[in-house]
């Protein structure tokens, strides 16, 4: 009985070790599951994100989205109301960001024009500045959707896995800016 228990524990440890090693590809790139935890920076709120290769641009749950002018430039004011996974509390923050661009989203429900802003999120131990459309996702399970543009910056997607990385960013974590990252050549607006 004791030998069986030791063998079972050894097998479980071996499986968990191989799982941890599966987080990087042979080329050393990170491998993410189709659902991951992320932290919205610098706010520090931990959220669930769906990694979706069917979407081009990432999307963030936002309400009260208003485009306005500041010093001759287009800006966007919006509110993010979400549950912080770290505390279990509902939290709310209003942001004002320069409008990066605008997109036309086509789907089964018709067409929708949305502003795009740059937001920072922590994935694993790295902070990424990424493009996000702003949309009311309150009827969705995940407040953050990461599309192909962001996925191409992160690494690989394993659709059979979830929660392969936990956000562990600090003030000294590497920051990858949108302007410094190359977009995949076959993704287009």
Question: What are these regions, as identified by a protein language model?
Answer:
Residues 1-7:
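Bacterial N-terminal signal peptides that target proteins for export
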Residues 7-16:
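Bacterial N-terminal signal peptides
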